Design a protein with these regions (language model features):
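N-terminal intrinsically disordered/low-complexity leader segments
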Residues: 1-2, 13, 170, 200
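Short secondary-structure transition hinges
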Residues: 48, 63, 87-131, 145-146, ...
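C-terminal peripheral helix-coil segments that are non-catalytic and often amphipathic
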Residues: 85-88, 92, 120-140, 153-200
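Helix-turn-helix
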Residues: 6, 10, 14-48, 52
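Hydrophobic alpha-helical connector segments
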Residues: 66-98, 136, 144-151, 182-185
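Short, structured helix-loop boundary elements
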Residues: 4-5, 25, 47, 51, ...
Protein backbone atom coordinates (compact mmCIF):
# COMPACT_ATOMS: atom_id res chain seq x y z
CA UNK A 1 0.00 0.00 0.00
CA UNK A 2 2.91 2.35 0.69
CA UNK A 3 4.16 2.00 -2.88
CA UNK A 4 0.69 2.75 -4.25
CA UNK A 5 0.45 5.88 -2.11
CA UNK A 6 3.88 7.04 -3.29
CA UNK A 7 2.87 6.53 -6.91
CA UNK A 8 -0.41 8.34 -6.32
CA UNK A 9 1.31 11.32 -4.70
CA UNK A 10 3.98 11.59 -7.38
CA UNK A 11 1.42 11.25 -10.16
CA UNK A 12 -0.86 13.89 -8.65
CA UNK A 13 2.01 16.40 -8.68
CA UNK A 14 3.03 15.42 -12.21
CA UNK A 15 -0.49 15.73 -13.64
CA UNK A 16 -0.98 19.05 -11.86
CA UNK A 17 2.25 20.43 -13.32
CA UNK A 18 2.14 18.93 -16.81
CA UNK A 19 -1.45 17.94 -17.53
CA UNK A 20 -2.46 14.53 -18.79
CA UNK A 21 -0.75 14.84 -22.18
CA UNK A 22 2.50 16.19 -20.74
CA UNK A 23 2.74 13.82 -17.79
CA UNK A 24 5.48 11.22 -18.05
CA UNK A 25 5.40 7.81 -16.40
CA UNK A 26 9.19 7.68 -16.08
CA UNK A 27 9.19 10.95 -14.14
CA UNK A 28 6.39 9.65 -11.93
CA UNK A 29 8.38 6.48 -11.20
CA UNK A 30 11.51 8.50 -10.33
CA UNK A 31 9.56 10.87 -8.10
CA UNK A 32 7.97 7.90 -6.33
CA UNK A 33 11.41 6.24 -6.02
CA UNK A 34 10.06 3.08 -7.65
CA UNK A 35 10.57 1.34 -10.95
CA UNK A 36 7.97 1.85 -13.66
CA UNK A 37 6.84 -1.76 -13.46
CA UNK A 38 5.52 -1.05 -9.97
CA UNK A 39 3.22 1.63 -11.40
CA UNK A 40 1.72 -0.90 -13.79
CA UNK A 41 1.37 -3.38 -10.94
CA UNK A 42 -0.98 -0.97 -9.17
CA UNK A 43 -2.54 0.82 -12.15
CA UNK A 44 -3.35 -0.45 -15.64
CA UNK A 45 -1.70 2.56 -17.25
CA UNK A 46 -1.49 6.33 -17.41
CA UNK A 47 -5.22 6.76 -18.01
CA UNK A 48 -6.15 4.52 -15.09
CA UNK A 49 -3.74 6.39 -12.82
CA UNK A 50 -5.16 9.76 -13.85
CA UNK A 51 -8.73 8.58 -13.35
CA UNK A 52 -7.85 7.24 -9.90
CA UNK A 53 -6.74 10.76 -9.00
CA UNK A 54 -9.97 12.25 -10.39
CA UNK A 55 -11.96 9.66 -8.44
CA UNK A 56 -10.18 10.56 -5.21
CA UNK A 57 -10.79 14.27 -5.81
CA UNK A 58 -14.44 14.13 -6.73
CA UNK A 59 -15.33 11.23 -4.46
CA UNK A 60 -14.18 13.31 -1.50
CA UNK A 61 -16.12 16.36 -2.70
CA UNK A 62 -19.27 14.30 -3.26
CA UNK A 63 -19.10 12.81 0.22
CA UNK A 64 -18.56 16.22 1.80
CA UNK A 65 -21.34 18.10 -0.01
CA UNK A 66 -23.80 15.21 0.33
CA UNK A 67 -23.31 15.39 4.09
CA UNK A 68 -23.93 19.14 3.96
CA UNK A 69 -27.10 18.77 1.88
CA UNK A 70 -28.53 16.09 4.18
CA UNK A 71 -27.92 18.05 7.39
CA UNK A 72 -30.75 19.74 9.29
CA UNK A 73 -29.23 23.21 9.00
CA UNK A 74 -31.20 25.98 7.23
CA UNK A 75 -30.56 26.48 3.49
CA UNK A 76 -28.45 29.62 3.88
CA UNK A 77 -26.12 27.86 6.32
CA UNK A 78 -25.97 24.85 4.01
CA UNK A 79 -24.74 27.11 1.21
CA UNK A 80 -22.00 28.45 3.47
CA UNK A 81 -21.11 24.90 4.47
CA UNK A 82 -21.17 23.75 0.84
CA UNK A 83 -18.63 26.39 -0.20
CA UNK A 84 -16.44 25.63 2.81
CA UNK A 85 -16.58 21.88 2.13
CA UNK A 86 -15.35 22.25 -1.44
CA UNK A 87 -12.62 24.63 -0.31
CA UNK A 88 -11.52 22.16 2.36
CA UNK A 89 -11.22 19.27 -0.10
CA UNK A 90 -9.38 21.44 -2.65
CA UNK A 91 -6.93 22.69 -0.04
CA UNK A 92 -6.30 19.14 1.19
CA UNK A 93 -5.26 18.19 -2.35
CA UNK A 94 -3.00 20.89 -3.84
CA UNK A 95 -3.10 19.04 -7.17
CA UNK A 96 -6.89 19.36 -7.35
CA UNK A 97 -7.24 23.00 -8.54
CA UNK A 98 -4.66 22.91 -11.38
CA UNK A 99 -5.88 19.52 -12.63
CA UNK A 100 -9.51 20.60 -12.62
CA UNK A 101 -8.82 24.00 -14.22
CA UNK A 102 -6.89 22.26 -16.98
CA UNK A 103 -9.72 19.78 -17.54
CA UNK A 104 -12.21 22.64 -17.77
CA UNK A 105 -10.01 24.42 -20.31
CA UNK A 106 -9.70 21.23 -22.36
CA UNK A 107 -13.42 20.49 -22.34
CA UNK A 108 -13.20 17.57 -19.95
CA UNK A 109 -11.28 15.50 -22.50
CA UNK A 110 -10.09 12.95 -19.95
CA UNK A 111 -13.17 12.87 -17.73
CA UNK A 112 -14.68 9.39 -17.72
CA UNK A 113 -18.24 8.32 -16.94
CA UNK A 114 -17.44 7.51 -13.31
CA UNK A 115 -16.18 11.05 -12.78
CA UNK A 116 -19.27 12.45 -14.50
CA UNK A 117 -21.39 10.55 -11.97
CA UNK A 118 -19.50 12.28 -9.16
CA UNK A 119 -20.09 15.65 -10.80
CA UNK A 120 -23.78 14.88 -11.30
CA UNK A 121 -24.14 14.01 -7.62
CA UNK A 122 -22.32 17.16 -6.50
CA UNK A 123 -24.65 19.29 -8.62
CA UNK A 124 -27.57 17.27 -7.28
CA UNK A 125 -26.58 18.10 -3.71
CA UNK A 126 -26.42 21.80 -4.56
CA UNK A 127 -29.71 21.59 -6.45
CA UNK A 128 -31.36 20.05 -3.40
CA UNK A 129 -30.17 22.91 -1.19
CA UNK A 130 -31.39 25.50 -3.71
CA UNK A 131 -34.77 23.78 -4.02
CA UNK A 132 -35.12 23.68 -0.24
CA UNK A 133 -34.41 27.40 -0.04
CA UNK A 134 -36.81 28.14 -2.90
CA UNK A 135 -39.63 26.27 -1.15
CA UNK A 136 -39.28 28.56 1.85
CA UNK A 137 -39.18 31.65 -0.37
CA UNK A 138 -35.60 32.43 0.68
CA UNK A 139 -33.88 31.54 -2.62
CA UNK A 140 -34.51 32.14 -6.28
CA UNK A 141 -34.80 28.79 -8.14
CA UNK A 142 -31.54 29.31 -10.04
CA UNK A 143 -29.90 26.59 -12.15
CA UNK A 144 -27.44 24.67 -9.95
CA UNK A 145 -24.78 24.65 -12.67
CA UNK A 146 -24.77 28.45 -12.83
CA UNK A 147 -24.44 28.70 -9.05
CA UNK A 148 -21.75 26.01 -9.00
CA UNK A 149 -19.72 27.87 -11.62
CA UNK A 150 -19.72 30.94 -9.39
CA UNK A 151 -18.34 28.86 -6.53
CA UNK A 152 -15.82 26.66 -8.30
CA UNK A 153 -14.14 29.25 -10.53
CA UNK A 154 -12.93 31.65 -7.80
CA UNK A 155 -12.03 28.83 -5.42
CA UNK A 156 -9.94 26.94 -7.96
CA UNK A 157 -8.27 30.12 -9.21
CA UNK A 158 -7.40 31.18 -5.66
CA UNK A 159 -5.83 27.86 -4.71
CA UNK A 160 -4.02 27.46 -8.04
CA UNK A 161 -2.47 30.93 -8.21
CA UNK A 162 -0.46 31.43 -5.02
CA UNK A 163 2.85 31.81 -6.90
CA UNK A 164 1.28 34.00 -9.58
CA UNK A 165 -0.22 36.28 -6.94
CA UNK A 166 3.19 36.66 -5.33
CA UNK A 167 4.64 37.74 -8.69
CA UNK A 168 1.82 40.23 -9.24
CA UNK A 169 2.31 41.62 -5.74
CA UNK A 170 5.98 42.32 -6.47
CA UNK A 171 5.06 44.43 -9.50
CA UNK A 172 2.02 46.27 -8.19
CA UNK A 173 0.74 47.84 -5.02
CA UNK A 174 -2.12 45.36 -4.91
CA UNK A 175 -1.44 43.04 -2.01
CA UNK A 176 -3.02 40.06 -3.75
CA UNK A 177 -0.53 37.68 -2.16
CA UNK A 178 -1.98 38.50 1.26
CA UNK A 179 -5.47 37.27 0.40
CA UNK A 180 -6.40 34.70 2.99
CA UNK A 181 -8.30 31.48 2.52
CA UNK A 182 -10.91 32.67 5.03
CA UNK A 183 -11.42 35.98 3.22
CA UNK A 184 -11.90 34.29 -0.15
CA UNK A 185 -14.31 31.69 1.21
CA UNK A 186 -16.34 34.35 3.03
CA UNK A 187 -16.52 36.44 -0.15
CA UNK A 188 -17.75 33.49 -2.23
CA UNK A 189 -20.31 32.62 0.44
CA UNK A 190 -21.64 36.20 0.47
CA UNK A 191 -21.83 36.46 -3.31
CA UNK A 192 -23.47 33.05 -3.70
CA UNK A 193 -26.12 33.86 -1.11
CA UNK A 194 -26.74 37.30 -2.59
CA UNK A 195 -27.25 35.68 -5.98
CA UNK A 196 -29.65 33.07 -4.61
CA UNK A 197 -31.54 35.67 -2.61
CA UNK A 198 -32.00 37.85 -5.70
CA UNK A 199 -29.95 40.72 -4.32
CA UNK A 200 -27.58 40.84 -7.30
Amino acid sequence: MESRNRIFGAAAKEFAAKGFAGANMDRIARAARLNKAMIYYHFAGKTALYRAILSDMFGAVRAAVTAVASSDRPPDEKIRDYVAAIAREAEARPHFPPIWLREIAEGGTHVDEATLVYLRDVLGALGGIIAEGARTGRFQPLPPFMVQAGIIAPLMVFFATSRLREKIARLTRADVAALSRADVIAHIQRVTLAQLEGKI
